[in-house]
Amino acid sequence: MITRLPGLLSRATNYAHIVDTPDAWAMVTDIYSSVYWLAARHRWMDLAELAVIKQGLAAERATPLAGIIAVRDEAGTFLNSGDFEGGLAVVDRAVVHAELSMEGREKALGLGLLHLRGLTLAGRRRDKKEVERHMAAAWRMVEEFPQDVDVCGMQFGPENTATHVMATWVDLEHYRRALNVAGDLGRRTLTLPATRIGPLYMNAARAKLALHDRDGALNSLVDAWEASPQMAKVSSTSQELLRVLISLHKRSNPTLTKLAKQARVGI
């Protein structure tokens, strides 16, 4: 994907300049969103921030939903840099704008995506009041989507909302709550893509490790690698979990040794 994006972006941008329609510019914002996502996963932060700036410029000519996704990614740069308060301010401004300018299912989808980003930011900030506000709002938007939908690579619905809730409970150190959510999800046949299933297992591993369940944490980390190996390889969460598990295991563990080799982490 990394090798294909430059050419795809060039062609989409040229096309958007020729036809100059909101849908054409929405394609450009979608590609920049992919650039941002990949750059953030690899921790190429300068590229991630540049992609979001370009995405925002394209979004000025694009569809309202493309604009929502651009704001969501902009707030993501604040999340990546640790400026959770700044990210929440970006989200809140976008929520107000969406409430006034959008309608129908598209409005519910846009607001849902924004509130999930706000939920993550509030959890990292450990602001329980903001967590409750964004969580409640996200679940209200889910009422419009009984099944998860994928729009421009963004998922929204009951499953993806639950994965965000679970991650936030881990951030707030409510580990049992997090694992209860994971257990509920585990009893379903999930429709989410691998890029969402992988983090679900990683967060389960975080919760289990915090509860001193080393074997359970390792099993969940293995599940994350099996669900999304490319993501697990570059994820800072996966890398940190692996290092901690290596430090805790006094005896050789074949499963841990295999994961360390895949991740190129020394034992």
Please name every model-derived segment.
Residues 1-267:
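Conserved binding/catalytic microenvironments
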